[in-house]
């Protein structure tokens, strides 16, 4: 039953991905291969490569290839008998041992839940609304590639032709002339390229004294009056609840036109150089509507920011979520590449030996002596900006990441090729490829399973390190390393560095617990006894 369910889910995902691409849908996780194919030039075919395409048309072959692989995998599982997929008794015992190691077992469950949350994508985190009900029609902006302009939902002026600001629509939902319903994700901010407005908290006037947000202490600091669109109108310094210091004022176009100086609540001088009179300018916002503005990085629990914002104005929770998605996608791309290369080279070295083994070892030694950081710096300088991205960084990591496993695979292959079953296969006429794939490779399963968790931890740590140093992903990718760098440069805002630290350490601990438990469960010496 589980086999058929997994097969049907794979087939359904492939069909939904293909249908979504044809209809312009943007489905969580399923549409990601097509998005990558559109962003990376060599993963799609334009009219320059395929002359039969229209001038504005392209074929995202990488996305279609991924959907085809999902479909074939589902069909393969569906037609295979359940008994053929059953684990051998040796590996079934290892799985049972792993379940008995509670630290690793619960870490695996927690990591699976985290991956499931990351797969929900724009359903949980994003600035686009999930559903909008307006004028008797339903819209799903988060699930379509098309940009819906603001005039579709009643926005006017400069916002009419630009993409609708769904956070503004959410605030005005239910009012006459505005959408009846706007359903936003749990975190209504994009991980990157989405600057949140400054969070504000209202201050209270009593008996001519301005009180802090607790309502008991006279306010000390900067207080502001804001336009309805969130732009700053006036900013005044207060001491002991009365104006004392400089005051500044701006028009809606952010032009500074007003300045004044107060001492102990008394106006000393003022200067106004805008339209009309100063009294008309001061009356643009309601008197007594002073509020406390939290500039970026804003602390946690201000506005709608559970963990606050970073210095660029991005919501930290959304940024951490985006960084988690980047790490998972990087691992899903990086691991198959390095294990394919490492297993292939290692098995060939161990099986053939001789000069091939000797030459390959020397090549590995030469490559391993290259300074990785210098290579990254040189490539970052020479590669055009539009070519930089996740694939470039993963290519550099994969160039150095496959070598550490080749010696383990080589040693195991040299041991297995001397077994009687390999000699019997040769006598029966089996070729080299058949022996390597059907007889030797299955016996390397324990090595692969043991190394995978540590490879995941390595790629997460490598991406964070490169981004921390400034040689990693571009700014349109969320990165825990860049957030850590931002927090360490602003230690007066400890919530920034602590968020990045706990996210990075927590994920590495989970993966390490899983890896150690797998190693312990597959270790034959733990269950060997000597007399």
What are these regions (language model features)?
Residues 309-531:
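Alpha-helical transmembrane segments of integral membrane proteins
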